[in-house]
Structures are given as structure tokens and as C-alpha cells.
From Swiss-Prot:
Cofactor(s) needed by this chain: Mg(2+)
EC numbers on record: 2.7.7.72
Reactions catalysed, as given in the entry: a tRNA precursor + 2 CTP + ATP = a tRNA with a 3' CCA end + 3 diphosphate; a tRNA with a 3' CCA end + 2 CTP + ATP = a tRNA with a 3' CCACCA end + 3 diphosphate
GO molecular function: ATP binding; CCA tRNA nucleotidyltransferase activity; magnesium ion binding; tRNA binding
Organism: Methanosarcina mazei (strain ATCC BAA-159 / DSM 3647 / Goe1 / Go1 / JCM 11833 / OCM 88) (Methanosarcina frisia)
Name recorded for this polypeptide: CCA-adding enzyme
Length: 454
């Protein structure tokens, strides 16, 4: 592979033309940020809350936001000695006062509550935090964010375009976003990669040769060993891995994306074509071509945020696969899709049916005690077809309890280890549909997922 392939300035400029905020966008963002800061201060004064600082953080504050994204993070910091209870009561009080001027508001919860609002078309998080003196002495996880902000702002000047290119490139490779649904690269991690390697081009070339266990320590101050595929030691906290949320698959998808791009640098790596929803006819043709069994477990989507939902869905996906394997069904792959109102866990099997007979092999005949116990268990039992000795061991052919994957899932799924909210939803009712029956699911986003699936 030729890693010396140059990435043309024309290509980078063509991408930046689509993703770099215009002067009008920047002015609007700054005006809204100023308004929000004034609203927070006015709310604090109205509620007689003193000694709070307002700080804009995140990509909007650092000049590394993509055109068309309207996210603002407003941190309301309280003195370090403030109790957690006071922080929540007074911080959320200020946030709710600001929300009176918003188009929409929703309480959310990370380590402690914060408020998400839509204000003049911008998606805004109002986050109370403690004003600690060091990112190594946190009282809550969000307290480190202002330190991240200062570190990036002091080093990113002149490289903002490289960050924008990298973010869009990662989006094109479906690896951008550190939320638990995606398990990819966070914005902060992306910025640190650009700071460390120096440019978009250098980062892509370096990443094309990464291996699991890659470690980057900008400040050379790491204090702990980490086991994740990529370790980016937090410059503000030597014990923390910024890339902890990055899964092995997304790490490897990024490596592959970089390699393919370097072979032939094209705009499609930034803006891939969006797949169309698959139609019934094409799906049925794919089924006929694959000659496998497709199963879909369908249930009502739990009313929880994605960071709560998706770990539970991945847990259910694994539990269903393990259950099928335990009963001798061969699982090819699994996947999850979630929308409103339904969630679907997909499973592809070599076959959805098994014969009535199952072979049970016991210990060698000469291991007398165990061999006789095994023989006594099966000899003459009504669910046994017959027995014989093979390779010196007792063998009995018995009736298989579950001969269809669908029947097994219908009877045993609720006995699997499922997350709390997913279990509650599945317990209300679920359906297992297979093969051509899956055409009953008409949601267009699901049909896009289904196209990728087959």
C-alpha cells in the first residue's frame, strides 16, 4: 500500500466548502452564546445565587464545529465547596429559569442532572458543575470539561480546518461519536489526534498503521496501564483514557477507512452515498440467494435515552445469540436497530430448524462409576431413540427439546440476562418473525438497516 499518496488541496477545499461554518453562521452562534450567558447570569441574580461562573465549552467554543450542527454546551460552575445537593438544586433552578425562554426543555441525567433545551434553533445543554482547581481532583465527571476546553483552545489555533476534515472523514466512515450507541471517536479525541500528529493528512497516514494497544501520551505523564484498543492519555488527567469508549471494531473500521482513502483519495470517503431502503422484492431475492434463516425479535422501544438503551440492546443481542448457540443453532451474525415505536434484534442462522434427534455422548465405558450413571440416565427413557457404544463411549440419541430457533426464543428469551428497561419492554410483549415475514416491518429507517444487513 502506498501511504505516500498526497491528498490534494483541491479535495480538502471541496470538503471544507461543505462543512466549514460561514461567517453568518459564526456570528449567529456567538450572538446566541452571548445571550445564553446573559440569561444564566440574570437567572442566578433572580434566584439570589452568587459566585457562579458561566463558561461556553465544546466544539462551538473552540471553533471546531461543523456547519449545520447547532450544539452549544453551557457550563454553570459553582465553588468547589458547594455540596452536591446544593449544586443540583441551585444549578437546575438556574437552568429551568433560562428554559422559560426556550422552545423546548428536557431534564437529562449523567452523573448528576442537567437540562437540554432548544433555544433559537440551537441544541443547548445547561450543565451545573464544580469549579475545581485541577482535572485530577474532580467532584463529578463533567468538572473536567472546562480543562479540556482550555487545553484545546491553547493548542488548536491554525488547525481548526484539519479538525473539521477529520470529523467529517470519521462521519463518512461511521466511526464518529463516543456515545454508547456508536462507540466511536469523540470530538475531544479527534482534536487531540490533530494536535498530536499535526494535520489531517498526517493523522490519516499514521492511523493506517495502527495496531490495538496504540498509546498516545501528549504530556508524557501517564500513570495507569489501559487495555483498550487505543489509549489517548488525557492531557489534563494522567489516569484517564480519552479513547475508553472506542470499541475494537470501530478502531479497526477507522484503520480500514484510512487505508482505503490513501489508495484513492476521493470525496466519497467524506460523503458516502446514503443507502436506499430495501424493497420487499429485493429482500426476498437476498433471502433466496443467502439460503440462511433470518430472525427478527420485535418489541416496543423502551422510553430511555440512547446511552441507557444501547448497552442493554447489545446485552440482549449477545444473550439471544448465546441462547441459540447453547441449543446447537449456528449463529452467523447479530445486529440491533432501534426506532420509534419499535426495536428489532436481528439474527442470521445457518438454519432456523434442527432435526428431532440430538446426540448425547457420555464418558468412556471403563470409567465405570460415571459411565453407569450416564447409562442409567438414558437407558429406557421415553425421550431416547436408542443407544450404542462409539469410540469406547456410551452414546444416546435423544429427542431434541427445541427444533426451531423461533420456538426457543419465544419460550426462553425472558429467562436470559436482559437489562432492566429492555426486560420490562420485552416482558410486555415481543414477537419473533422470520424470513419473508420480516417484510411486515415497513419503517424506512429499518429498511435502510436491512439493506446493509443482507
Amino acid at each position: 500500500m502506498d501511504t505516500d499518496t498526497s491528498i490534494s488541496e483541491d479535495l480538502k477545499l471541496a470538503v471544507l466548502e461543505k462543512i466549514k461554518p460561514t461567517e453568518a453562521e459564526r456570528k449567529e452562534l456567538m450572538a446566541v452564546q452571548d445571550e445564553l450567558a446573559a440569561e444564566v447570569k440574570a437567572a442566578a441574580e433572580k434566584l439570589c445565587v452568587s459566585d457562579i461562573f458561566v463558561k461556553m465549552v465544546g466544539s462551538a467554543a473552540r471553533g471546531t464545529w461543523l456547519s449545520g450542527t447547532h450544539d452549544i454546551d453551557v457550563f454553570i460552575s459553582f465553588p468547589e465547596e458547594t455540596s452536591r445537593k446544593d449544586l443540583e438544586i441551585r444549578g437546575m433552578g438556574i437552568a429551568r429559569e433560562v428554559a422559560k425562554h426556550a422552545e423546548y426543555a428536557e431534564d437529562r441525567h449523567a452523573e448528576h442532572p442537567y437540562l437540554n433545551i432548544v433555544y433559537k434553533g440551537f441544541d443547548v445543554d445547561l450543565v451545573p458543575c464544580f469549579r475545581v482547581c485541577s482535572a485530577c481532583q474532580l467532584k463529578s465527571a463533567v468538572d473536567r470539561t472546562p480543562f479540556h476546553n482550555e487545553f484545546i483552545k491553547s493548542r488548536i489555533k491554525g488547525r481548526e480546518d484539519d479538525v473539521l476534515l477529520m470529523k467529517q472523514f470519521m462521519r463518512g466512515g461511521r466511526v464518529y461519536g463516543s456515545e454508547l450507541k456508536t462507540q466511536g471517536f469523540s470530538g475531544y479525541l479527534t482534536e487531540l489526534l490533530i494536535i498530536y500528529y499535526g494535520s489531517f493528512e498526517k493523522t490519516v497516514k499514521a492511523a493506517s498503521s495502527w495496531k490495538p494497544g496504540k498509546k498516545i501520551d501528549i504530556m508524557q505523564h501517564s500513570e495507569l496501564e489501559h487495555s483498550e484498543p487505543l489509549v489517548m492519555v488525557d492531557p489534563t488527567d494522567p489516569k484517564r483514557n480519552v479513547a475508553a469508549a472506542l470499541s475494537l471494531d470501530k478502531f479497526c473500521m477507522f484503520i480500514d477507512h484510512c487505508r482505503e482513502f490513501l489508495k484513492s483519495p476521493e470525496i466519497k470517503f467524506f460523503f458516502p452515498e446514503s443507502p436506499l431502503p430495501i424493497e420487499d422484492k429485493e429482500f426476498l431475492e437476498k433471502l433466496e440467494s443467502r439460503k440462511t434463516s433470518q430472525l427478527a425479535i420485535v418489541f416496543e422501544t423502551p422510553d430511555v435515552v440512547d446511552d441507557v438503551l444501547y448497552p442493554q440492546l447489545y446485552k440482549m443481542e449477545q444473550a439471544a445469540s448465546s441462547l441459540l448457540s447453547e441449543y446447537d443453532f449456528s449463529v452467523i451474525k447479530t445486529g440491533v436497530w432501534s426506532g420509534k415505536p419499535q426495536t428489532v434484534v436481528m439474527l442470521e442462522l445457518i438454519s432456523g430448524t434442527l432435526p428431532n434427534v440430538k446426540k448425547r455422548t457420555g464418558p468412556p465405558v471403563w470409567v465405570r462409576e460415571h459411565a453407569e450413571k450416564f447409562k442409567d440416565k438414558y437407558e429406557g427413557a421415553e425421550n431416547v431413540f436408542g443407544g450404542y457404544i462409539e469410540n469406547g463411549k456410551y452414546v444416546y440419541e435423544v429427542h431434541r427439546k427445541y427444533t426451531t430457533a423461533k420456538g426457543l426464543l419465544e419460550e426462553q428469551l425472558l429467562n436470559c440476562s436482559l437489562g432492566k428497561q429492555v426486560y420490562q419492554s420485552v416482558n410486555k410483549g415481543f414477537e419473533v418473525i422470520e424470513n419473508a415475514e420480516i417484510c411486515r416491518l415497513k419503517d424506512q429507517d429499518f429498511r435502510v438497516f436491512l439493506r446493509k444487513w443482507v
